[in-house]
């Protein structure tokens, strides 16, 4: 979806940044390491961490709630890890990117995320 974003299409130089920073294509994923964010489809969160951070923000109608949560984890002083040995099998459908409403929700949530956190980076603040 990020690659299909009209802004990325207007500015091809953003494609490399999207691939590297958001899709994490700059490493082979064969080790466990801290990352900026992980997908919300498979997160494991300790009870203590959830008590400190809270729940997912219900203001995100569809999309970006996982990134928002991970930013909140980092801002709390905790870390988000990609665990290379963890696996999950997803069974079922996902909304099609061909539906305008679905894309609208993704774009709306992206704007909401930027308004909430700015251009946050765990490496250098916002």
Region locations from a protein language model:
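Active-site-adjacent helix/loop segment of glycosyltransferases
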Residues: 67-126
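A short, structure-level motif marking secondary-structure boundaries and short turns
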Residues: 31-33, 53-55, 95
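A short, terminal or domain-edge coil/loop segment
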Residues: 28-39, 82, 115-119
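Generic signal for short, ordered secondary-structure residues
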Residues: 28-29, 49, 89, 93
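Generic structural signal for conserved hydrophobic packing positions in ordered secondary structure
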Residues: 7-10, 46, 110
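A short, conserved alpha-helix in the catalytic core of glycosyltransferases
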Residues: 36-54, 59-87
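Short, flexible, basic/aromatic active-site loop/helix in glycosyltransferases
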Residues: 1-35
């Amino acid at each position: 979806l990020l690659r299909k974003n009209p802004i990325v299409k207007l500015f091809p130089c953003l494609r490399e940044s999207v691939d590297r920073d958001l899709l994490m294509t700059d490493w082979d994923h064969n080790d466990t390491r801290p990352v900026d964010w992980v997908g919300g489809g498979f997160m494991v969160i300790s009870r203590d961490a959830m008590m400190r951070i809270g729940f997912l923000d219900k203001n995100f109608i569809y999309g970006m709630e996982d990134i928002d949560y991970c930013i909140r984890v980092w801002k709390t002083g905790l870390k988000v890890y990609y665990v290379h040995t963890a696996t999950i099998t997803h069974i079922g459908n996902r909304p099609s990117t061909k539906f305008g409403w679905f894309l609208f929700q993704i774009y709306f949530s992206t704007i909401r995320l930027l308004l909430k956190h700015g251009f946050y980076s765990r490496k250098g603040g916002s």
